Amino acid sequence: MSSHAATPAASAVKPVVVVVDTFGGPIRHHNPELPLIYWDDAAVTRGDGVFETLLIRDGRACNLERHSKRFAASAALLGLPEPDAEYWRAATAEAIESWPKDVDASCVWTLTRGRAATNRPSAWITVKQIPVEHLEQRH
């Protein structure tokens, strides 16, 4: 386990946000200080979407295959488009590259039905520090 995860320096790490194009377009970083979701996104208006949380430890996503399968199964249950596992892995790898390897993190994949105006799914990945109190509960 990363011993540096609960250090004071780690608390200054800003979240990483990566926007995932559900049609396979470019993966792009998003400023975590700026809004991301539109007012008419189904995640906001109806809570319509799925998410999956992964542990990032030592610069890698843990149990990636298992999480990919569960994410796809959750999307299928809601009738959302099947997430492209390779594309989501690539987006996750890109997000992790911006995260310090010695700081444990949670990585959340989010896929929503999208905006009413476009009828196009919305998707993003966030990587953020695991709260110190959660790390302390593990010991």
Predicted feature residues:
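Conserved alpha/beta cores of soluble small-molecule-handling proteins
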Residues: 1-139
